[in-house]
């Protein structure tokens, strides 16, 4: 839907940048055996239906857009990974485990795509994990969180209204975010302003 298109925009920007850089290097005959990968990182959820409708849907769209890339998922929340293992016997990878797997597969270029809405605690941990693997790949880059630039707030507000207006009609609508102790908590107030 509209929201998924909005969420996929950062990965397209990042992927195009990586591809242009690779083309530049290849033109000079320096490197020609690029093995590309996209790592989709979400906070995760302990609700299987929600996971299928949202996280898995994004993964399917990314695989369809980039069929020549290795596409893997990772769950940034340790609590969610542990709950998935205990309740569903699913071994979800952490971002570090997924990057290690890609390294073992001989991946050379990685685009890390967080589905995080704000650039908060989880996203900063993800960036730190990616930094630790900088030497393991020829190139690794992390896309922005959904709300990274001022225009992102306007785009997301518009996408939300477009996807919800028929269902909501004239009724009041309450949207909630759980907040964070991180400075990125200000993102919620900025989003509220964009929605007014």
Q: Where are each of the predicted segments found?
A:
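Active-site-proximal alpha-helix that buttresses catalytic centers in soluble enzyme cores
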Residues: 24, 31-196
């Amino acid at each position: 839907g509209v929201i998924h298109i909005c969420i996929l925009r950062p990965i397209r920007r990042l992927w195009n940048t990586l591809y242009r850089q690779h083309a530049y290097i290849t033109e000079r005959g320096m490197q020609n055996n690029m093995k590309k990968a996209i790592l989709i990182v979400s906070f995760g959820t302990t609700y299987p239906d929600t996971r299928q409708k949202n996280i898995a849907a994004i993964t399917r769209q990314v695989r369809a857009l980039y069929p020549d890339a290795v596409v893997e998922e990772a769950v940034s929340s340790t609590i969610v990974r542990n709950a998935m293992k205990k309740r569903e016997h699913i071994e979800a990878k952490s971002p570090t485990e997924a990057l290690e797997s890609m390294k073992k597969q001989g991946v050379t270029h990685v685009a890390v795509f967080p589905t995080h809405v704000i650039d908060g605690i989880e996203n900063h941990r993800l960036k730190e994990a990616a930094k630790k693997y900088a030497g393991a790949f020829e190139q690794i880059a992390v896309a922005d969180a959904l709300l990274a630039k001022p225009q992102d707030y306007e785009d997301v507000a518009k996408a939300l209204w477009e996807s919800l207006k028929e269902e909501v009609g004239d009724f009041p609508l309450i949207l909630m975010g759980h907040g964070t102790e991180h400075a990125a908590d200000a993102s919620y107030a900025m989003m509220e302003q964009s929605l007014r």
